[in-house]
Amino acid sequence: MDFFSSQKITNHITRIYLPGDVQAYLVEGMDKSVLIDTGCGIGDLKAYVATLTGKPITVLLTHGHLDHAPGAVQFDTVYMNLADRGIYAAHDLIQQRIDYVETTSFAGKYRREDLLPENSADAFLDLQDGMRFDLGGLHITAYACPGHTPGSMAFLIEEDRMLLLGDSCNPFTFLFDITSLGVSSYE
């Protein structure tokens, strides 16, 4: 089954459409690539990304929720702000991911075997405010953006002057969830 599709949005950035009505972004420099977010952990995202780039891939997670992070289990180098470690542990559970996906346009379009295994965030590297990633002629800077979750991060692709925010700013940003910091964190 085809779980993924993509769209080139700049010379350096490809949007990847993932199961569960979410997107990831592949950012390519001359030497390296960064994958921002990995979705619900359905299907072989790593193999799909390999069809888009042959460069080494580092994963940067905007936050630890089940629709953005469980696909990270497939990748060797993963950064997440560790303030979201507990959120990731609670959201990576297979049944929670199934329950979520069944509320999306992807409901019923996968088999249980298509879900990647549960994974600990113990191997994740701590993503900190101000960290800068050099991809070769292209740079990404991480910025703390707490609110949606305590560890939410935004990524500035400097040369493209593009800021990727994950769920920190969109028409459906949750600030009422038990793990959210609320409106006051945005003030």
What kind of region is each of these model predictions?
Residues 2-51, 154-170:
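Conserved beta-strand hairpin/beta-sheet module of binuclear metal-dependent hydrolase folds
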Residues 9-15, 130, 139-141:
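Short, hydrophobic/aromatic-rich segments at coil-to-beta transitions
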Residues 13, 57, 124, 140, ...:
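Short, conserved active-site loop motifs that form the nucleotide-linked donor/cofactor pocket
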Residues 16-17, 116, 122-124, 144-146:
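Short Gly/Pro-enriched turn/cap motifs at secondary-structure boundaries
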Residues 17-19, 63, 82, 146:
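Residues at the C-termini of beta-strands that transition into short coil/loop
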Residues 22, 122, 130, 137-140:
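Short coil/loop residues immediately preceding or within conserved phosphate-binding loops
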Residues 33, 40-41, 132, 139-187:
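Metallo-beta-lactamase
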Residues 42-132:
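Active-site HxH/HxHxD metal-binding segment of metal-dependent hydrolases
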